[in-house]
């Protein structure tokens, strides 16, 4: 069987909503990281067989964002590209599809990843094309509609996190403790330069000057559980009796009865991920390509998994996906030295950690999406980049797991072994 190698990878710093990257198009962010990833990998653009890139909020961006990324990065016109759409899992799904293509013998070197500018997502009119006739009309926020809204139950992703609190018995205190811990870990990581090696600067215009944007700007220094406890609930709770309406695709075993206050708001801006901008790129190659071009890979991709859950509790999608990925890789959770589990919400992160029996000292050691941010189309690739760079810094970190939940009730996971 062919071996799959991550030759190199990088990401932009993550921008806040309406922050430093708001005027940088998603395709441009993607092109910057692809160009840098190829440079770091020592792979010539003409040796790339295909580009696969995630992007969710594509309204108004023009045809095939991935193609724009590839051409913008200097790939020859002969190199095909396609845009991957699996909501939050898109960046990681691109890696899985690249792995499949290489194993099938269709390619030897594929650039994958994801990009998103949530700040630039437009508002849309749904009735203007055929004539609004008269009266005021409503605009649709495509950032919410296409990125953060459950199409099956007609409510925000935040409500699915409230549902998880109800099912798994997760308290507001647990959520705020988790959110504060994420912020504190990221604050320490930034202070020590832990992210420096994985970030490629993005030139941005500030007034009349061009500066380099190279530090995640979403983290909130000084966060504490006590401070987060003062924040108000951000999302409507799920309907009464939602626990009895959920169809479980795996049997929950770690349900706590700690919180009897069902259907009260617990999810806040402090224990949920942000709305953010950013991009990440990964160069994946076959073993044959590694030998042919004398490449120096970072890690092997040794397994992946995908799974589905009831959309009402979409955040626990990583449970079946991670189990599948680890089974394919021939490992158990005890073999995993580092975990990057995307923090869409503290609620789902806690439920996933319980069900997968995570050792929390190994999970998101430099913080996660609650502190770093969650540019939806890029996050699946971003957490792989962060995982692999952290594994390189730790001599005892041999194997790593990266996983995300996906709006609509899915999960995706990948397992890596350090070279």
Q: Where are the regions that the model predicts?
A:
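Beta-strand segments within the central parallel beta-sheet cores of soluble alpha/beta enzyme folds
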Residues: 6, 46-54, 80-85, 110-115, ...
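Active-site pocket-shaping loop/turn-to-helix segments
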Residues: 12-38, 57-59, 82-99, 119, ...
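Conserved N-terminal phosphate-binding loop of PLP-dependent enzymes in the Aspartate aminotransferase
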Residues: 116, 121-123, 158, 163, ...
């Amino acid at each position: 069987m062919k071996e799959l190698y991550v030759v190199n990878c990088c990401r932009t710093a993550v921008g806040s909503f309406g922050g430093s990257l708001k005027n940088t198009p998603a395709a441009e962010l993607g092109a910057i990281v692809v160009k840098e990833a190829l440079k770091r990998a020592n792979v010539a653009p003409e040796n790339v067989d295909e580009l696969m890139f995630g992007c969710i909020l594509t309204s108004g961006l023009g045809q095939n964002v991935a193609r724009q990324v590839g051409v913008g990065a200097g790939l020859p016109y002969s190199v095909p590209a396609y845009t991957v759409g699996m909501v939050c899992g898109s960046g990681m799904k691109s890696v899985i599809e690249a792995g499949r293509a290489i194993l099938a013998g269709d390619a030897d070197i594929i650039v994958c990843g994801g990009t998103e500018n949530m700040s630039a997502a437009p508002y849309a009119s749904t009735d203007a094309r055929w004539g609004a006739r008269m009266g005021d009309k409503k605009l649709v926020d495509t950032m919410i509609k296409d990125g953060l809204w459950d199409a099956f139950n007609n409510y925000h992703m935040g409500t699915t996190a409230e549902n998880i609190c109800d099912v798994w018995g997760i308290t507001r205190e647990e959520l705020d403790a988790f959110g504060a811990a994420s912020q504190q870990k990221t604050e320490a990581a930034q202070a020590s330069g832990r992210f420096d090696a994985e970030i490629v600067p993005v030139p941005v215009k500030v007034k009349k000057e061009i500066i380099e944007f190279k530090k995640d700007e979403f983290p909130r220094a000084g966060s504490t559980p006590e401070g987060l406890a003062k924040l108000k609930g951000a999302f409507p709770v799920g309907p009464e009796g939602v626990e009895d309406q959920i169809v479980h695709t795996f049997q929950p075993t770690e349900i706590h009865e700690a919180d009897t206050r069902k259907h009260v708001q617990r999810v806040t801006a402090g224990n949920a991920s942000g709305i953010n901008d950013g991009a990440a790129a990964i160069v994946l190659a076959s073993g044959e390509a590694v030998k042919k071009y004398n490449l120096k890979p970072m890690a092997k991709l040794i397994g992946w998994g995908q799974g589905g859950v009831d959309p009402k509790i979409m955040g626990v999608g990583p449970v079946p996906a991670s189990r599948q990925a680890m089974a394919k890789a021939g490992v158990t959770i005890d073999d995993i030295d580092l975990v990057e589990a995307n923090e869409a919400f503290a609620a789902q992160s806690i439920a996933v950690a319980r069900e997968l029996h995570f050792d929390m000292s190994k999970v998101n050691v430099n913080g996660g999406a609650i502190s770093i941010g969650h540019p939806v189309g890029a996050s699946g690739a971003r957490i792989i980049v962060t995982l692999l760079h952290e594994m390189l810094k730790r001599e005892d970190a041999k194997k790593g797991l990266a996983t995300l939940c996906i709006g609509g009730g899915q999960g995706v996971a990948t397992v890596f072994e350090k070279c």
